[in-house]
Amino acid sequence: MISFSSFYQQIADSNLQHWLETLPSILGKWQRDHKHGNLPKWEKVLNKLHYPAPDQVDFVDSVTVGSGEQLSPGEKEKLENLLRLFMPWRKGPFHIHGIHIDTEWRSDWKWDRVKQHISPLKNRTVLDVGCGSGYHMWRMLGSGAKRVVGIDPSPLFLCQFEAVKRLAGPHHPVHLLPLGIEELPPLDAFDTVFSMGVLYHRRSPIDHLLQLRDQLRTGGELVLETLVIDGDENAVLVPQDRYGKMNNVWFIPSVAALMLWLKKCDFTDIRCVDTDVTALAEQRRTDWMPNESLVEYLDPNDITKTVEGYPAPKRATIIAIKNQPNQETVNG
């Protein structure tokens, strides 16, 4: 069974210690709720990942564990077969003992767009909301973060993350907890909070922004990356049914509308640092994710539109600072 005890020990004497009042029972319930699904099967695979400590790791320019020279061809083949049992791999890529996990998303491209605009992560405590299998968490660690906590309720993402961590070494201060942000108390403790690719999946985007704010210390930095449309501060797309074949897309605002929402939620120093139309090369079918991908979500005769006729995915990165909350505005 996946254990979270090392995380509990690490936060016992930190500014996250009050989380221990509720976290163990919440995670215990999550494990009980998933004991009859795929989780036990994936945990058996994790228990087979007994390999020597890697001769090198790189989280600065990539997520690389091992040089590829430690394992024999047979050992490498066995490891690859085990890692393939966690397919589909969506966020990456990862390089594990010479094995290239070519994920659906080139998450390294997103990181390259974001990292140049954020406050330095050195010695910061970081929260990554909707972290997937943890690719960006490793890159945050490589940027000098003191501790990185990711939350994502998916058991598959948890097991993919655990696979990489067990091969990289359990001592790294990076942790994935299978939670949604609505299960977090207001911690007011993180120096930087990332929410990338989450907002449009939330039925109440304002509530999501308030939940993100509640995790930041005053003066902490929010890094928000999400789908946007063109338009003024009143422009918001609400898909009638599906968007890019996804039935869980609720609100896609313009950059101006999103900045207004953040201001209403008592953020300050709000700025859009990047906009980017998702390229077909950034999200695509691979050997490690053989299902439909972006090309199938777009109009085959006009890739500037989704198959439903909406504008094709365009993403913006917004950075904002948590201001001292105005209780009358928030609660009034």
UniProtKB/Swiss-Prot annotation:
Q: What is the enzyme's class at the highest EC level?
A: transferase
Entry superkingdom: Bacteria
Q: Name one GO biological process term.
A: tRNA wobble uridine modification
| Cited SUPFAM superfamilies | S-adenosyl-L-methionine-dependent methyltransferases (SSF53335)
* Family annotation (Pfam families): Methyltransf_9 (PF08003)
Q: Which UniProt keywords apply?
A: Transferase, tRNA processing
Protein purpose: Catalyzes carboxymethyl transfer from carboxy-S-adenosyl-L-methionine (Cx-SAM) to 5-hydroxyuridine (ho5U) to form 5-carboxymethoxyuridine (cmo5U) at position 34 in tRNAs.
Similarity annotation: Belongs to the class I-like SAM-binding methyltransferase superfamily. CmoB family.
Q: How does it assemble?
A: Homotetramer.
Q: Which protein are we looking at?
A: tRNA U34 carboxymethyltransferase
Name its species. Answer: Shewanella putrefaciens (strain CN-32 / ATCC BAA-453)
